[in-house]
Amino acid sequence: MNLEALCKEAELSFYDDELVSENGRKIYRIYVQKEGGVNLDDCARLSEILSPIFDVEPPVNGEYFLEVSSPGLERKLSKIEHFAKSIGELVKITTNEKEKFEAKIIAVDDENITLENLENKEKTTINFNDIKKARTFIIW
């Protein structure tokens, strides 16, 4: 099953998916994006496309709930493409060595992310494979 193609059919772009357990319930979440933002009708349209397919070809074993949503303003970055689409945004990164960064993403190539420190404007380049956890954030 090609989630990217199915999302495109609903005029959305696939961002990520995850399987989580909350209050003893298994939830399969699909995150999507769209120029101008995702609304409830977009999520419902994709859910209507996916539900009959998932009835025949379940994405996970056992009983689950399907959720379709946008990744939000403060979202997890887990793929190099996520970083590339987030150039200019603020990010919190924890590396595998437990170093922490709060910076602006200023450049991304095939394997490196270049950041600009928010306070001193110093630039740092991190290899994507050295990143344990990353998330965009907003200063309100």
Swiss-Prot record:
Q: What is its main location?
A: cytoplasm
Q: Which GO terms describe its cellular component?
A: cytosol
Gene3D superfamilies, sorted: Ribosome maturation factor RimP, C-terminal domain, RimP-like superfamily, N-terminal
Query: What does the entry give for GO biological process?
Result: ribosomal small subunit assembly; translation
Where does it live in the cell? Cytoplasm
Q: Which UniProt keywords apply?
A: Cytoplasm, Ribosome biogenesis
Which Pfam families has this protein been placed in?
Answer: DUF150_C, RimP_N
Coiled coil (UniProt feature): none
Say yes or no: keyword Acyltransferase present: no
On whether Acyltransferase is a keyword of this UniProt record, the answer is: no
Q: Which domain of life is it from?
A: Bacteria
Q: Which InterPro entries does the record associate with it? A: Ribosome_maturation_RimP (IPR003728), RimP_C (IPR028998), RimP_C_sf (IPR036847), RimP_N (IPR028989), RimP_N_sf (IPR035956)
Q: What does this protein do?
A: Required for maturation of 30S ribosomal subunits.
Similarity field: Belongs to the RimP family.
Check the record and name the HAMAP family matching this protein: RimP (MF_01077)
- Name under which the protein is recorded: Ribosome maturation factor RimP
User: Which organism encodes this protein?
Assistant: Campylobacter jejuni subsp. jejuni serotype O:23/36 (strain 81-176)
